[in-house]
Amino acid sequence: MYAIIETGGKQIKVEEGQEIYVEKLDAEAGEEVSFDKVLFVGGESAKVGAPFVEGASVTGTVEKHGRNKKIIVYKMKAKKNYRRKQGHRQPYTKVVIGKING
């Protein structure tokens, strides 16, 4: 059984026992989290939401928080001596999917 959930403005296909990386969640490591925005549940009988499947949820456990690799943002305007260099590291949360209800 699998499901498609929406979190952090992104849609992610998940299965039970899978480890996923999502935008930073406001939960401590070891805490249970529930994703209620379930768009699709697949298995023997598929359920498609309009836009969400009623009564469906996906639960998981927060394993850790972290930050992705640094990306460099560089702006430059030719012939004007304008240069700006800035780094960015996006925070993430690693979640282990436990149960798909739906």
From Swiss-Prot:
<dbReference type="GO" id="GO:0006412">
    <property type="term" value="P:translation"/>
</dbReference>
<dbReference type="InterPro" id="IPR036164">
    <property type="entry name" value="bL21-like_sf"/>
</dbReference>
<dbReference type="InterPro" id="IPR018258">
    <property type="entry name" value="Ribosomal_bL21_CS"/>
</dbReference>
<protein>
    <recommendedName>
        <fullName>Large ribosomal subunit protein bL21</fullName>
    </recommendedName>
</protein>
<comment type="similarity">
    <text>Belongs to the bacterial ribosomal protein bL21 family.</text>
</comment>
<dbReference type="Pfam" id="PF00829">
    <property type="entry name" value="Ribosomal_L21p"/>
</dbReference>
<dbReference type="InterPro" id="IPR028909">
    <property type="entry name" value="bL21-like"/>
</dbReference>
<dbReference type="GO" id="GO:0003735">
    <property type="term" value="F:structural constituent of ribosome"/>
</dbReference>
<dbReference type="GO" id="GO:1990904">
    <property type="term" value="C:ribonucleoprotein complex"/>
</dbReference>
<comment type="function">
    <text>This protein binds to 23S rRNA in the presence of protein L20.</text>
</comment>
<keyword id="KW-0689">Ribosomal protein</keyword>
<keyword id="KW-0687">Ribonucleoprotein</keyword>
<dbReference type="GO" id="GO:0005840">
    <property type="term" value="C:ribosome"/>
</dbReference>
<keyword id="KW-0699">rRNA-binding</keyword>
<dbReference type="GO" id="GO:0019843">
    <property type="term" value="F:rRNA binding"/>
</dbReference>
<keyword id="KW-0694">RNA-binding</keyword>
<comment type="subunit">
    <text>Part of the 50S ribosomal subunit. Contacts protein L20.</text>
</comment>
<dbReference type="GO" id="GO:0005737">
    <property type="term" value="C:cytoplasm"/>
</dbReference>
<dbReference type="InterPro" id="IPR001787">
    <property type="entry name" value="Ribosomal_bL21"/>
</dbReference>
